[in-house]
Amino acid sequence: MINWQVIAQLVSLGVIVLVGPAVIILLSLKRGNL
């Protein structure tokens, strides 16, 4: 059996880890341009 809850948690963690820094970089770039 596949534990979908564990997979969902891992995917959400991966998305947060990947998207978090990207959002911070984009915000810093936008503030720098303004």
Curated annotation (Swiss-Prot):
Keyword Plastid among UniProt keywords: yes
GO annotation, biological process: photosynthesis
Chief location of this protein within or outside the cell: plastid
Pfam families reported for this sequence: PSII_Ycf12 (PF05969)
Compartment annotation: Plastid, Chloroplast thylakoid membrane
Keywords: Chloroplast, Membrane, Photosynthesis, Photosystem II, Plastid, Thylakoid, Transmembrane, Transmembrane helix
Alphabetical list of NCBIfam families matching this protein: PRK13686.1
Functional summary from the UniProt entry: A core subunit of photosystem II (PSII), probably helps stabilize the reaction center.
Protein name as catalogued: Photosystem II reaction center protein Psb30
Taxonomic classification: Eukaryota, Rhodophyta, Bangiophyceae, Bangiales, Bangiaceae
